[in-house]
Amino acid sequence: MSAQQLNIDNADLEKLNDKDRTELRQFLANEQQRSQIQAQTHSLTQMCWSKCVPGTIKNPKLDKSEETCLANCVERFLDVNYLTMKHLNGMRN
C-alpha cells in the first residue's frame, strides 16, 4: 500500500515530524499486512469451499466428508504456505 494509493500527498507527509512519519509508515505497513491476510483468507475459503462443497447445500451443517475435506484442505494450504515462507527466508539468509 503506497502513499499514493491512500491519496496522501508528499507535501502533507513533509509536514509531519519524524515520530509521526514513522508511526504512519508503521500503520500503513500493518494495514497492508492485514489486507494481505484477509485476501489470503478469502482465497483459502473460496478454494477449499469449491473443492469440498461442490453441490448445493442441503443441511445447515456440513456432512462428515465435507467437514473432513475442509479441515484437510486448510491444513494442506497452511503447510504449503509455511514451507514456502521457510524456503524464502532460507534464500534470503
Curated annotation (Swiss-Prot):
Topology term for the membrane: Peripheral membrane protein
Location, primary (coarse class): mitochondrion
Domain of life: Eukaryota
Compartment list: Mitochondrion inner membrane
Record keywords: Chaperone, Disulfide bond, Membrane, Metal-binding, Mitochondrion, Mitochondrion inner membrane, Protein transport, Translocation, Transport, Zinc
Example of a GO cellular component annotation carried by this entry: mitochondrial inner membrane
Cross-referenced SUPFAM superfamilies: Tim10-like (SSF144122)
Disulphide bond pairs: 48-73, 52-69
Ranges spanned by the short sequence motif Twin CX3C motif, renumbered to the chain: 48-73
Keyword field contains Membrane: yes
MF GO annotations: metal ion binding
Gene Ontology biological process terms from the UniProt entry: protein transport
Pfam family, one: zf-Tim10_DDP
Record comment regarding domains: The twin CX3C motif contains 4 conserved Cys residues that form 2 disulfide bonds in the mitochondrial intermembrane space. However, during the transit of TIM8 from cytoplasm into mitochondrion, the Cys residues probably coordinate zinc, thereby preventing folding and allowing its transfer across mitochondrial outer membrane.
Subunit structure, as described in the record: Heterohexamer; composed of 3 copies of TIM8 and 3 copies of TIM13, named soluble 70 kDa complex. Associates with the TIM22 complex, whose core is composed of TIM22 and TIM54. Interacts with the transmembrane regions of multi-pass transmembrane proteins in transit.
Family affiliation: Belongs to the small Tim family.
Role this protein plays: Mitochondrial intermembrane chaperone that participates in the import and insertion of some multi-pass transmembrane proteins into the mitochondrial inner membrane. Also required for the transfer of beta-barrel precursors from the TOM complex to the sorting and assembly machinery (SAM complex) of the outer membrane. Acts as a chaperone-like protein that protects the hydrophobic precursors from aggregation and guide them through the mitochondrial intermembrane space.
Protein name: Mitochondrial import inner membrane translocase subunit TIM8
Source organism per UniProt: Gibberella zeae (strain ATCC MYA-4620 / CBS 123657 / FGSC 9075 / NRRL 31084 / PH-1)
Taxonomic placement: Eukaryota, Fungi, Dikarya, Ascomycota, Pezizomycotina
Gene name of the record: TIM8
